[in-house]
């Protein structure tokens, strides 16, 4: 960690004497720069191109050195549009990698890849900054204990639990509740773990980024009245940005998260939406730099790039970074090198189902498709493991029987199968839950359900003790006691109607 100005601040004026080059060639977002002999910048150094365009407007473009070409030339990738740049323009070597603001000042704000605020809320305190390129924590610093990261969301904690300091892949199409699930996790980590979150929008649609920001303000995750009370920092590198920005915005978000973990000793949630866009941007940059493409046209350095990002996301003795990454699967081909490389790093997968969303069951997490390496008796305990397996068996049997029910009806099933179907429908509804961040829309107060309560509830349903209760009593409640109370209310209401 260092206390210094950011690369986008007054540092440039102090460094003008230091190391000056000039632009020799521009091909889209890639620049070749000539420096005096013996004054070559290092790989990953930030360069700043300064000058004026044809209309006399000030131009300032930050680039990152990617290759040393020989003959005092370097090749750099621009972090913003290169419109208006011409050959011969002055280039200043800042002498250091890109550095971005970190710490409490970043909460509630939106940044670009350079760590500059883009939300029109004024400047950010840049006294504490950190370089975006760092090595992963050493083995001796790592916390190797396998611990569950309790989210307070029943379906996640029971069937596909997250690992503290782990990486989770979030799979789901448009409109199945990915954003609401993300916001609920941000809210719950702040309340239950006293932690903060960092959201990295990598190659997002600008509209989606704006929608997320507005929804966060509406739900209180970002506190407009007192910005320091906010629970999240946002870093966006949108679809319209050059590939250099999209390739590095994930590292900017990760750097902010690392500060909260290492210095503030907090549990941090890091969201990356979408990890595929990070790979895609790397592929574009690789082609622009003239590297020979590898399988399916991807960059030959795909595994290395992915590893350098993913290995920094981990638990140390100070705190943890738990990462939730939205994964786009091109043409639904799971063997594509981009998702295949991502899978190697994931500890759990949360799959959102359009079928469940259509039934009105939220969160629409598919209980049978979602997986976790943590769901082992040696880690979660025999009780949790047994309950989760029995819940999955019941739901699987219900799924198998659905075709028969559709053709012949429930009456043709055996007594045992009818009981299984009834319990499975209760389980399906009990896996739904009212969210704190959705209170504004649903009108029902959000519920955080501890792991012990979750296990107790599902054990009661499986044991048959609650067979007499109507299935709608289990819909959108917190713990099992609320379901029994709701059943009594439903009974009273039906009597009054009669």
From Swiss-Prot:
Function: Produces ATP from ADP in the presence of a proton gradient across the membrane. The catalytic sites are hosted primarily by the beta subunits.
Top-rank EC class of the record's enzyme: translocase
Name of the protein this chain belongs to: ATP synthase subunit beta, chloroplastic
Family that this chain belongs to: Belongs to the ATPase alpha/beta chains family.
Cellular-component GO terms for this entry: chloroplast thylakoid membrane; mitochondrion; proton-transporting ATP synthase complex
Range of residues in the leader sequence: none
NCBIfam families, per database record: atpD
Matches recorded under InterPro entries: AAA+_ATPase, ATP-synt_VA_C, ATP_synth_F1_bsu, ATPase_a/bsu_AS, ATPase_alpha/beta_chains, ATPase_F1/V1/A1_a/bsu_N, ATPase_F1/V1/A1_a/bsu_N_sf, ATPase_F1/V1/A1_a/bsu_nucl-bd
Molecular function GO terms recorded: ATP binding; ATP hydrolysis activity; proton-transporting ATP synthase activity, rotational mechanism
């Amino acid at each position: 960690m260092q206390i210094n100005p950011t690369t986008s601040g007054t540092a440039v004026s102090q460094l003008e004497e230091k190391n000056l080059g000039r632009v020799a060639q521009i091909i889209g977002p890639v620049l070749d720069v000539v420096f005096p002999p013996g004054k070559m910048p290092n790989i990953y150094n930030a360069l700043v191109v300064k000058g004026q365009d044809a209309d006399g407007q000030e131009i300032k473009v930050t680039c990152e050195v990617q290759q040393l070409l020989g003959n005092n030339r370097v090749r750099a990738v621009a972090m913003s549009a290169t419109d208006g740049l011409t050959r011969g323009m002055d280039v200043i070597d800042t002498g250091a990698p890109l550095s971005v603001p970190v710490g409490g000042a970043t909460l509630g704000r939106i940044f670009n890849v350079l760590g500059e605020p883009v939300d029109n809320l004024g400047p950010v305190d840049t006294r504490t900054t950190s370089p975006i390129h760092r090595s992963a924590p050493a083995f001796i610093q790592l916390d190797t204990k396998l611990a569950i990261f309790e989210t307070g969301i029943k379906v996640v904690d029971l069937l596909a639990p997250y690992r503290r300091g782990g990486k989770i892949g979030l799979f789901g199409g448009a409109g199945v509740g990915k954003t609401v699930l993300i916001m609920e996790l941000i809210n719950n980590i702040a309340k239950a773990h006293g932690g903060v979150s960092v959201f990295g929008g990598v190659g997002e649609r600008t509209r989606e980024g704006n929608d997320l920001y507005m929804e966060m303000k509406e739900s209180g995750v970002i506190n407009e009245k007192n910005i320091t009370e906010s629970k999240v920092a946002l870093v966006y590198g949108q679809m319209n940005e050059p590939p250099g920005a999209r390739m590095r915005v994930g590292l900017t978000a990760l750097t902010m998260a690392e500060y909260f973990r290492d210095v503030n000793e907090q549990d941090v949630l890091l969201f990356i939406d979408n990890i595929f866009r990070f790979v895609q941007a790397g592929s574009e940059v690789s082609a622009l730099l003239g590297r020979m493409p590898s399988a399916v046209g991807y960059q030959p350095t795909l595994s290395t790039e992915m590893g350098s990002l993913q290995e920094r996301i981990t638990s140390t003795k100070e705190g943890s970074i738990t990462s939730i990454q939205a994964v786009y699967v091109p043409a639904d081909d799971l063997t594509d090198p981009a998702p295949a490389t991502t899978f190697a790093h994931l500890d759990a997968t949360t799959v959102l189902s359009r079928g469940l969303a259509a039934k009105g069951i939220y969160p629409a997490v598919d209980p049978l498709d979602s997986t976790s390496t943590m769901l082992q008796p040696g880690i979660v305990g025999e009780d949790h493991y047994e309950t989760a397996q029995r819940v999955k068996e019941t739901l699987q049997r219900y799924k198998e029987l659905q075709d028969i029910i559709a053709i012949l009806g429930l009456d043709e099933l055996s007594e045992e199968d009818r009981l299984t179907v009834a319990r499975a429908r209760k389980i399906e509804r009990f896996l739904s839950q009212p969210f704190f961040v959705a209170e504004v829309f649903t009108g029902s107060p959000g519920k955080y359900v501890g792991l012990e309560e979750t296990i107790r509830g599902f054990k009661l349903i499986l044991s048959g003790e609650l067979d007499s209760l109507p299935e709608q009593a289990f819909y959108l409640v917190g713990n099992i006691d609320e379901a029994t109370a709701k059943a009594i209310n439903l009974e009273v209401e039906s009597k009054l109607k009669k």
